[in-house]
Amino acid sequence: MAPRKNAKGGGGNSSSSSSGSPTGCTSGGSSSPGARRETKQGGLKNGRKGGLSGSSFFTWFMVIALLGVWTSVAVVWFDLVDYEEVLAKAKDFRYNLSEVLQGKLGIYDADGDGDFDVDDAKVLLGLKEKPAPKPTVPPEEADMYPWLEDQVLESPGRQNIEDEVYEQVQSLDETVYSEPGENLPQEPEGPAEELQPDDHVFVGSDADDRYEPMGTGAVHEETEDSYHIEETASPAYSQDMEDMMYEQENPDSSEPVVVDDAERTYQETDDVTYRDYDEQDHAVDNSNTILEEPHMPPAEEQQEVPPETNKKADEPGKKGKVKKKKPKLLNKFDKTIKAELDAAEKLRKRGKIEEAVNAFEELVRKYPQSPGARYGKAQCEDDLAEKRRSNEILRRAIETYQEAASLPDAPTDLVKLSLKRRSDRQQFLGHMRGSLLTLQKLVQLFPDDTALKNDLGVGYLLIGDNDSAKKVYEEVLSVTPNDGFAKVHYGFILKAQNKIAESIPYLKEGIESGDPGTDDGRFYFHLGDAMQRVGNKEAYRWYELGHQRGHFASVWQRSLYNVQGLKAQPWWTPKETGYTELVKSLERNWKLIRDEGLAAMDRTHGLFLPEDENLREKGDWSQFTLWQQGRKNENACKGAPKTCSLLDKFPETTGCRRGQIKYSIMHPGTHVWPHTGPTNCRLRMHLGLVIPKEGCKIRCANETRTWEEGKVLIFDDSFEHEVWQDAASFRLIFIVDVWHPELTPHQRRSLPAI
């Protein structure tokens, strides 16, 4: 017992024994279990007195952590916090810390100076007499819609015209409407005064205000000489296109047709494209990209664009950057009902469109003179039209936008946004003339807004009034000579007027500017074409740049109305097309077809009409058309009844809505400029009828061939092709367009006509 006692005690013997004696060490070792038990008991005892052990603390920590996790899950699951609203407010309210603090402490503003400071503290503590309050006007930027803050760029010089605008809007013709758009591939954007609404723009259909019934009149060899509406389907709807077909509403034209008429017709192919919901439903997913590129131009034609050109072209939009300012969309009355407006808008932003429509309709009923309520209603109807793909609802939205702009005391920015959006939606429905009237009124209200004038020029082009458009762009360039958008459009008009050399600098400088709306395949197309015609070898540099920027499938294949993934090669064999029966029938009956063509040439009432698309450098070239855009010309077929009867058996050609069937006669001394057709959706057959022994040839891409009587040549006219007729007598061929063999039956039914 002594060793244990010594070990427990504090004497020196214990110390020496444990350190120096082996016995002590053994003794100490034998006594350790008891010591450990006592220590353990002592530890438990101390733990009860002193608090939780380490393991108990960790257990409670984990319980609390898990409780927090499950609480967070419950908050998200039961939607206790509206995170979308939080994020929206975080984005919209860009106030710095001092502004936030002033907002919080503003209620303690005792001296009426608009903020909380030392003087306010003195007043509250009774150290200073509180002054009489002065009437103050709350800052407009604190009272505007948070959901519309980023929609507007202030126009220079337009800050003091709100009162003036109402009087002018009241005098507007009630038949004019408009609305704001986002990126109409691209809505032509302007400089600082351009408003920037946050609403998306729908894909639209090519709709012109004119439609000429097909007779025996001139039929145009389709080229890219006209400014078309692109047939690209909206990404949001691309999956629906294959399954849905609706009738198109097109009040300004009897059928959706892409018209190739450089002299008269402009149709937009920007990312801003036009097609109403009914037409959009049976569109297909088109693209300007075709996968195969079998041919490239010669080495000398593949030189890259000069570095300075590449640099400018690769940085579009930087030049035109302007500082955005917050819009002034609430008048004094709307500020008093801002909470109600925000609550309704919250429903719209959360995708509860039907509820939002009802909420805004109730606000319009309660406050009929509120521009904000009316504008919100128009936006909801706009969204609902997109959701339901309804032209009828969209027409209601168009009317409501006009109502919002026409209300008393409507803020200037709201007027501009409402009318711009209405104009865009009118174009979407094909109401080109109504949209033009709206744009005219916008320019009348905002004469210093260059972007609106540029839009007005496009409006004139869309109805074929190139002369008026030219005047608009001349006015723009006189004020802003470096406006790239105005330059490319002015250059386009000059080229359409056959002022080839004069058009080149405008097209070139406009593209190089990098301004919004200038990076467009049509402008690369026309610039290269103009350069080719004046012998400028830089043409292929611009074609190459257009290809690099995704506008052309290749340097050779420069069509703009394309379906992605179709086999692409310049020359085809009958077996490759799958239309061997048609080819055999044409070749077996070539003399019958020839004789009816020759008989038509002898008639005096003009069945053959001159080509009028400015494709000829020189010479005489005429055509006699039997089918166009998949429609039979009954009057023309009276002049070639057997030929028409023969072709009725082959729907791949008679039903080709993107092609023609026609006789073509070319007289000696004719040269047709290099050109391309508008689409990759067709192939073109040439049946030789009367072919001189030498002097007639056709080049497609980099291969040149000649015709033979009674034989069919097949090529893809979306590739560059060129024709020479240097024989001593006329050349007569029969042209038969067929659908590209890889198009599906649905695509053949639904693709808009060209």
From Swiss-Prot:
Residues the entry annotates as binding 2-oxoglutarate: W621, S664, R684, M685, H686, R731
Top-rank taxon, per record: Eukaryota
Topology with respect to the bilayer: Single-pass type II membrane protein
Protein name: Aspartyl/asparaginyl beta-hydroxylase
Gene Ontology biological-process entries: peptidyl-aspartic acid hydroxylation; regulation of cytosolic calcium ion concentration
Keywords for the protein's UniProt record, in alphabetical order: Calcium, Dioxygenase, Disulfide bond, Endoplasmic reticulum, Glycoprotein, Iron, Membrane, Metal-binding, Oxidoreductase, Phosphoprotein, Repeat, Signal-anchor, TPR repeat, Transmembrane, Transmembrane helix
Enzyme Commission code: 1.14.11.16
Organism per entry: Bos taurus (Bovine)
Keyword NAD applies: no
Keyword DNA repair: no
Ranges of biased composition (kind: Basic and acidic residues): 261-284, 309-318
Binding site for Ca(2+): D109, D111, D113, D115, D120
Gene name of this polypeptide: ASPH
Required cofactor(s): Fe cation
Annotated catalysed reactions: L-aspartyl-[protein] + 2-oxoglutarate + O2 = 3-hydroxy-L-aspartyl-[protein] + succinate + CO2
